[in-house]
């Protein structure tokens, strides 16, 4: 009997070691405790720069804004959707690494203008002016990639997966392929039936923008300084052209001299690749104030001065594990190409994050992932919001939806299939 009692005591002791006791109105309630970390992996310590719990904030913000977005949205309606997208991007990336910066830039140009609604994919017709026609978007690429993947999805699950979801998931895979962090995404976005060409012309960031303009532009979309600086880390891949920074080499702010904030050694290196051109633009004038063209931009380079290409990864400096951090380290060395990039070191509230990301790879990857999640959820259309669901206009709504889907599937940029060359596309500036 004593043996049985002893066994019972031991059993209860073990049970209570993994469970707690709570008293609720006189009743004893057993509560399970969280199991100990048995992986042997030491939990990362908080960086001194991490003053707020960004993950908790994001999840709360996501709950308020995502509405009907949720994980595995297509689990029942198209269970292979995300696998098809992942497989497609990986195959294309293996053949053409330029797909990574192309898709990240395409995502930004879509989401930054009225939200992640695939409006940038819409072609023009008699009733619609396409965002593709806005000067900042003329050099966008990756439309054929989205079209190819969407077409495959249509053969498996016709009329189910939105173009907006295809784009955000494709961009996430592109980030991962380029050496960036993975980040979870909810799905269930709907597509827009309208485009916003004028807004794109007016509000997409310019390469010569001041830090005040940049921060204000991002702030109106809910991004603080930390998030804004982290998103700029994507400028560590892709290319840009001489015409969009040559004023910093030869005629900064109309002085006839180089930008004093540009490292002199780097300045001489750039001059060998971008020789002086009398047509070099000044900030805020001419086409130079628009978004830089990519390697196969839709804007003719005639009359634009130099059009040499500069690899923003500097031959993948430091390897893929330095995705992002090499960008911040170069800013600390005064080697930022774009005026807008180097401006991040001009204010204490942004410079502190440049320093932090230059020295802490894990902090950057975490913040970049969180900011990309937030960007991908910006002003999404969900449920009926992507359709005209008024009963009196139901037929019209269905017609427009069908028309939109066709446009999305056959989205063309006006560029040939060579638009995805082995060169890399510039990102959103």
Question: What is the predicted function of each stretch?
Answer:
Residues 1-429:
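Catalytic cores of secreted/periplasmic or lumenal enzymes
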């Amino acid at each position: 009997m004593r043996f049985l009692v002893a066994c019972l005591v031991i059993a209860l002791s073990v049970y209570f070691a993994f469970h707690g006791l709570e008293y609720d109105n006189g009743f004893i309630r057993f509560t399970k405790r969280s199991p100990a970390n048995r992986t042997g992996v030491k939990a990362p310590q908080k960086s001194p720069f991490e003053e707020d719990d960004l993950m908790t904030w994001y999840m709360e913000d996501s709950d308020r804004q995502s509405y009907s977005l949720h994980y595995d949205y297509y689990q029942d309606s198209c269970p292979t959707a995300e696998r098809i997208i992942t497989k497609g991007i990986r195959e294309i990336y293996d053949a053409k690494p330029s797909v990574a910066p192309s898709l990240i830039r395409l995502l930004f140009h879509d989401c930054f203008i009225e939200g992640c609604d695939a409006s940038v994919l819409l072609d023009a017709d008699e009733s619609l002016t396409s965002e593709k026609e806005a000067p900042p978007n003329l050099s966008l690429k990756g439309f054929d990639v989205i079209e190819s993947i969407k077409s495959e999805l249509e053969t498996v699950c016709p009329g189910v997966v939105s173009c907006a979801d295809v784009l955000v998931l494709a961009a996430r895979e592109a980030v991962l392929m380029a050496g960036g962090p993975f980040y979870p995404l909810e799905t269930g976005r709907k597509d827009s039936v309208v485009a916003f060409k004028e807004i794109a012309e007016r509000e997409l960031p310019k390469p010569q923008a001041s830090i005040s303009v940049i921060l204000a532009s991002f702030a109106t979309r809910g991004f603080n300084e930390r998030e804004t600086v982290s998103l700029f880390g994507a400028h560590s891949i892709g290319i840009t052209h001489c015409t969009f920074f040559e004023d910093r080499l030869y005629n900064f702010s109309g002085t006839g001299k180089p930008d004093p904030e540009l490292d002199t050694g780097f300045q001489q290196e750039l001059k060998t690749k971008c020789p002086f051109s009398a047509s070099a633009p000044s900030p805020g004038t001419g086409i130079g104030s628009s978004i830089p063209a990519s390697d196969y931009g839709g804007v003719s380079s005639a009359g634009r001065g130099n059009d040499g290409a500069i690899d923003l990864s500097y031959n993948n400096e430091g390897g893929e594990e330095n995705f992002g951090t090499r960008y911040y380290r170069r800013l600390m060395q005064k080697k930022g190409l774009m005026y807008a990039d180097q401006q991040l070191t001009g204010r204490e509230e942004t410079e502190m994050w440049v320093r932090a990301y230059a020295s802490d790879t894990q902090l950057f990857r975490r913040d970049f992932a969180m900011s990309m999640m937030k960007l991908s959820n910006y002003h999404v259309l969900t449920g009926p919001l992507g359709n005209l669901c008024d009963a009196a206009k139901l037929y019209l709504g269905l017609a427009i939806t069908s028309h939109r889907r066709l446009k999305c599937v056959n989205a063309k940029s006006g560029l040939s299939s060579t638009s995805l060359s082995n060169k890399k596309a510039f990102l959103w500036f």
